[in-house]
């Protein structure tokens, strides 16, 4: 049943994002929903293609969430503020000068102590292009927006919306 109905036969499982391409390649899973660079990894390996990107669903969306408990925030107010400020500064840096810092960010993220994926794979979604399948590489200048358009501003209303959607 591929109609998306409630009795559709699909097995949902939890797999850490970096392991998703290898798990699919091994035949343990048949598809996955994940942020980049793991979709691009499937394209590069020739084992899968993205069906749709989050950019096509909701442009300039907050793609990741940094959430802490109220207790932790109250116990660590200075640390909490500093971490949020650091993330906002990093987002500003990534979008500065028409994304001029992205190639440097790709080199940093490709290190094994960070994301550890190949720089070419990370660059595909960080530097204004996206490869939907082998040979179908498209210009998508705002595929990843980190600060422009207030994309990652910590709006309370966004947090509430996400929580209500997860509860459904």
Show the residue positions of the predicted features:
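Alpha-to-beta junction loops
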Residues: 25-34, 46-48
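A conserved hydrophobic position in a structured secondary element of the catalytic/binding core
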Residues: 34, 68, 75
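Ligand-binding "clamshell"
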Residues: 41-55
């Amino acid at each position: 049943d591929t109609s998306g109905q409630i009795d559709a036969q699909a097995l949902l499982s939890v797999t850490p994002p970096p392991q998703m391409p290898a798990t699919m390649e091994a035949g343990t899973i048949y598809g996955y929903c994940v942020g980049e660079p793991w979709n691009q990894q499937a394209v590069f390996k020739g084992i899968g293609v993205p069906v749709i990107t989050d950019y096509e669903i909701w442009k300039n969306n907050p793609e990741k969430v940094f959430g802490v408990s109220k207790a932790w925030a109250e116990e660590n107010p200075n640390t909490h503020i500093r971490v949020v400020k650091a993330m906002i500064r990093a987002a500003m840096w990534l979008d500065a000068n028409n994304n001029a810092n992205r190639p440097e960010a790709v080199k940093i993220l490709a290190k094994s102590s960070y994301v550890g994926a190949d720089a070419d794979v990370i660059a595909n979604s960080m530097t204004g292009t996206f490869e939907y399948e082998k040979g179908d590489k498209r210009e998508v200048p705002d595929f990843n927006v980190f600060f422009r358009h207030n994309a990652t501003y910590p709006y309370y209303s966004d947090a509430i919306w996400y929580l209500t959607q997860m509860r459904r």
